[in-house]
């Protein structure tokens, strides 16, 4: 069993976080979840619930631990806590800017800072469009320091029909980077 941190910031795309946490837990991994106040609002607006756990099948709850964003004293704040990867999905441009400047003023930003300084996998899923030059500079700075930047761009050649299809595709890309085996991972096969 591996241990993953999933941070959820206030950008649109709550379904991506729900899908990722559900699949990691279904695969038997421990998932530490940190939700920003803005993400709580987005969760309510997009999925009509105030409880993140209410969006996850109850049989998976045993593998999920929710942390308060203000719990800077959490063991997750320390590089001595072993974590296999940190994923922030969706990741707002405000969170990207803070991480790129090394701001660790809450648990969500701190775990990203720890991942960078400890040279552990950090996957950021920025959900913003269009991107300004400032956004691009921040993303470049993070990529140059080891972060994987994974914009939630659907793989159109798989012909998604629903929002769930798109979420599954994007989460499959995250899981592939983590080198996990999941039915959500799709591989291109030339039909001709």
Curated annotation (Swiss-Prot):
Belongs to the UbiX/PAD1 family. Flavin prenyltransferase that catalyzes the synthesis of the prenylated FMN cofactor (prenyl-FMN) for 4-hydroxy-3-polyprenylbenzoic acid decarboxylase UbiD. The prenyltransferase is metal-independent and links a dimethylallyl moiety from dimethylallyl monophosphate (DMAP) to the flavin N5 and C6 atoms of FMN. FMN binds at residues 10-12, 36, 92-95, 127. It comes from Chlamydia muridarum (strain MoPn / Nigg). Its EC number is 2.5.1.129. InterPro entries: Flavin_trans-like, Flavoprotein, UbiX-like. Keywords: Flavoprotein, FMN, Prenyltransferase, Transferase. Gene3D superfamilies: Flavin prenyltransferase-like. This is Flavin prenyltransferase UbiX. It comes from the Bacteria. GO terms for molecular function: carboxy-lyase activity; flavin prenyltransferase activity. It holds the Pfam family Flavoprotein. The lineage of its organism: Bacteria, Pseudomonadati, Chlamydiota, Chlamydiia, Chlamydiales. It catalyses: dimethylallyl phosphate + FMNH2 = prenylated FMNH2 + phosphate. Dimethylallyl phosphate binds at residues 157, 173. Coiled coil: none annotated.
């Amino acid at each position: 069993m591996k241990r993953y941190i999933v941070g959820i910031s206030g950008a649109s795309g709550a379904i991506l976080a729900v899908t990722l946490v559900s699949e990691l837990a279904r695969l038997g991994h421990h998932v530490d979840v940190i939700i920003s106040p803005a993400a709580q609002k987005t969760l309510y607006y997009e999925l009509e619930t105030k409880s993140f756990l209410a969006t996850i099948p109850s049989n998976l709850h045993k593998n999920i631990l929710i942390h308060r964003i203000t719990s800077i004293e959490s063991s997750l704040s320390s590089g001595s806590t072993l974590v296999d990867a940190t994923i922030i999905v969706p990741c707002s441009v405000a969170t990207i800017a803070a991480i790129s400047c090394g701001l660790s003023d809450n648990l969500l930003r701190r775990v990203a800072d720890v991942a960078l300084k400890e040279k552990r996998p950090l996957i950021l899923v920025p959900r913003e469009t269009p991107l300004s030059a400032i956004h691009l500079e921040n993303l470049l700075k993070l990529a140059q320091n080891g972060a994987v930047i994974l914009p939630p761009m659907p793989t159109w050649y798989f012909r998604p029909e629903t929002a769930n299809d798109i979420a599954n595709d994007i989460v499959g890309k995250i899981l592939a980077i983590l080198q996990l085996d999941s039915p959500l991972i799709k591989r291109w096969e030339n039909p001709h």
